[in-house]
Amino acid sequence: VPAQDNFVFGVAKTTGITSAEQWLAAKTAVKFGAIAAGDGTYDTSKVVEVALGLPIQIVSGYKGTAPIRLAFNSGEVGGLSNSWQSFRSTWRKELETGEVMIVLQLSAKPHPDLPKVPLAMNLAKTDESRKLIQAVAQAHGAAVRPYVLPPGTPKDRVDILRKAFMEAIKDPELLNEAGKANLEINPGSGEELERNVRELLRLEPSVVARLKEILK
C-alpha cells in the first residue's frame, strides 16, 4: 500500500463546533457532504453517526470531493469526512483561515499532524461500536489502494516483490517529488496489508450484519 488514508472529520467554522465534545452535545445535526454508500465520505460519516450518536445529516449524491468542497464553501453543507492527506493538499486555504476545523479522527492511531484530535474509537461506549468503527477505519484506511498479486503466486516471488516495493517507496527522488506536490507517502507493508485484510475477513457475523444494515 503506497499511501494509507487517515480519515478525519472537518466541520465549518460557522457551525460553532470546535471539538468532538461540542459536536456530541450539539442540538442541530451538521450536514455532511458525501458521495454514496461504499465511498469513504459516506461510510465513515454513517458509522460515527450510528456508533457514537453524532448529530450528522448526510447529504449524498455529490460526484466527488471537489463538488463537496464547493458546497461547503457556499454553505450548502457544514462538514465532510475525508482523508487527512486530501484535506492537507486540497483544503489548505480553509485550514489556514480556520474555515474548517478538524475535530475527530477515524484511524486506529492519531496522525502525527493531529496529536490532539481525538480518535472516534476512544469515544465509543460499547464493544460493538468500537468494532464497527475499527472495521470501517481499516477498510477505508490501512487496506485502501492495495497492490495485489493473483492467487497461487509462489511465496518467494511474493516476498521479493514485497521487499522491492518497500525499498522503491523510500526512494529519495520519489519522496522529494511527493513533498513538492504536498502528497504524503505513508506506505504499509504487504505483511501489514495481509493482516488487516484477514482481520476484516474474520469479523463476527453480528458485526458484518450490522455494517450491512448501516451502510446500505
Task: Put a short name on every predicted segment.
Residues 31-33, 80, 103:
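Short, well-ordered beta-strand segments
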Residues 46-47, 51, 66-80, 85, ...:
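Short helices/loops that flank or line small-molecule/ion binding pockets
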Residues 1-2, 55-61, 78, 91-140, ...:
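Short beta-strand->loop
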Residues 71-76, 117-121, 201-203:
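Short, surface-exposed amphipathic charged segments that create phosphate/polyanion-binding patches used
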